[in-house]
């Protein structure tokens, strides 16, 4: 592009915010013009995040001072409840918005209000938002003014299911179980006793068994692709003693005669960020660390009619900031891979 895309980031002091800054610094078509934080206004980005010394000369500003309306696109890397109040004004001024919070993901307003415990401030805008699972909604994302970036668990679980659901390969009335593990960074950067090293290190636990906010988001995607499946969906998240990474083990029943690996390979043939591994493989979280990748394998359980899907992502990249940049690329007609060609870190 001859003219660079002017980008603003609201709430840039969290883990998804710094991940956006890291990825966008390597993007050839982007100028990060504004970064906001009410609590750190006036602090240089490079002082707050030493990893970005020599990369950014910007300082954090309050949203009112940052001139966000002069940006081409604004990312909201904010807690739930912020974007729904501030995004409408920017959209009215012609600014495109990608919201990394959950404010616009769930289309049914009462369902959203039940799970997030607040009244939605912009219910009329929810129907205009495009759900930004890039590999599912490319065409709609390209035309969107507002993209609801998916959650990390929904991304990790939905990507292996989408091709099978689109071809109605799952058996209705049978259980569909997602057993998921996340690194501690998924809890965010705020103070939380459960995220302390002495609590999360050398420990492994399930949480949200009675209900997790990502459950209705995943069910919404499933229900939109194949009838009779979402009702049997069970989702149990776990906290693993690692910083970043996400692993989903999904147990499902397929219709007779299905060749799921071929279905997955055909669907993702032109998707640079989804890697279908050979039968018998077991993807590892370290194989996607720092990269905008989802690696998937599928095989039938021994002496059983149950199929086992394994899916891994970096929760901060493909599960958040990387997918947001991928959506931005689609919105501006760029190659999806621009700024996202980082090789995973190993070890």
Curated annotation (Swiss-Prot):
GO terms for molecular function: N-acetyl-gamma-glutamyl-phosphate reductase activity; NAD binding; NADP+ binding. The active site is at residue 152. InterPro entries: AGPR_AS, AGPR_type-1, NAD(P)-bd_dom_sf, NAGSA_dehydrogenase, Semialdehyde_DH_NAD-bd. It is found in: Cytoplasm. One of its GO terms (biological process) is L-arginine biosynthetic process. It catalyses: N-acetyl-L-glutamate 5-semialdehyde + phosphate + NADP(+) = N-acetyl-L-glutamyl 5-phosphate + NADPH + H(+). CDD domains: AGPR_1_C (cd23934), AGPR_1_N (cd17895). Its EC number is 1.2.1.38. Keywords: Amino-acid biosynthesis, Arginine biosynthesis, Cytoplasm, NADP, Oxidoreductase. It comes from the Bacteria. Pfam families: Semialdhyde_dh, Semialdhyde_dhC_1. GO terms for cellular component: cytoplasm. Catalyzes the NADPH-dependent reduction of N-acetyl-5-glutamyl phosphate to yield N-acetyl-L-glutamate 5-semialdehyde. PANTHER family: N-ACETYL-GAMMA-GLUTAMYL-PHOSPHATE REDUCTASE, CHLOROPLASTIC-RELATED (PTHR32338:SF10), N-ACETYL-GAMMA-GLUTAMYL-PHOSPHATE REDUCTASE, CHLOROPLASTIC-RELATED-RELATED (PTHR32338). This is N-acetyl-gamma-glutamyl-phosphate reductase. It comes from Neisseria meningitidis serogroup B (strain ATCC BAA-335 / MC58). The gene is argC.
């Amino acid at each position: 592009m001859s003219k660079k895309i002017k980008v603003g980031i609201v709430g840039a002091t969290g883990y998804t915010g710094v991940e956006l800054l890291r990825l966008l610094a390597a993007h050839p078509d982007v100028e990060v013009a504004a970064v906001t934080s009410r609590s750190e206004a006036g602090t240089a980005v490079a002082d707050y995040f030493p990893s970005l010394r020599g990369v950014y000369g910007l300082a954090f500003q309050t949203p009112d001072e940052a001139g966000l309306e002069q940006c081409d696109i604004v990312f909201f890397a904010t807690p739930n409840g912020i974007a729904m109040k501030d995004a409408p004004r920017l959209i009215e001024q012609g600014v495109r918005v990608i919201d990394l919070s959950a404010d616009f993901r769930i289309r049914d307003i009462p369902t959203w209000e039940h799970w997030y415990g607040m009244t939605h401030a912009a219910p009329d805008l929810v129907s205009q938002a495009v759900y930004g699972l890039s590999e599912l909604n490319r065409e709609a994302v390209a035309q969107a003014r507002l993209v609801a970036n998916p959650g990390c668990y929904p991304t990790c679980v939905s990507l292996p299911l989408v091709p099978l659901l689109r071809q109605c390969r799952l058996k209705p009335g049978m259980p569909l179980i997602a057993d998921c593990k996340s690194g501690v960074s998924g809890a965010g950067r705020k103070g939380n006793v459960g995220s302390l090293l002495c609590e999360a290190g050398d420990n492994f636990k399930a949480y949200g068994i009675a209900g997790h906010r990502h459950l209705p988001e995943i069910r919404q995607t499933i229900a939109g692709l194949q009838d009779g499946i979402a009702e049997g969906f069970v989702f149990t998240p776990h906290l693993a003693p690692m910083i970043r990474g996400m692993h989903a083990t999904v147990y499902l029943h397929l219709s007779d005669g299905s060749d799921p690996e071929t279905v997955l390979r055909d669907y993702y043939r032109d998707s640079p960020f989804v890697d279908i591994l050979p039968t018998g493989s077991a993807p590892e979280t370290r194989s996607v660390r720092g990269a905008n990748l989802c690696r998937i394998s599928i095989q039938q359980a021994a002496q059983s009619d149950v199929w086992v899907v394994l899916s891994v992502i970096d929760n901060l990249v493909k599960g958040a900031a990387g997918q947001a940049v991928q959506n931005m690329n689609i919105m501006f007609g760029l190659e999806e891979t621009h700024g996202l060609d980082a090789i995973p870190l190993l070890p």
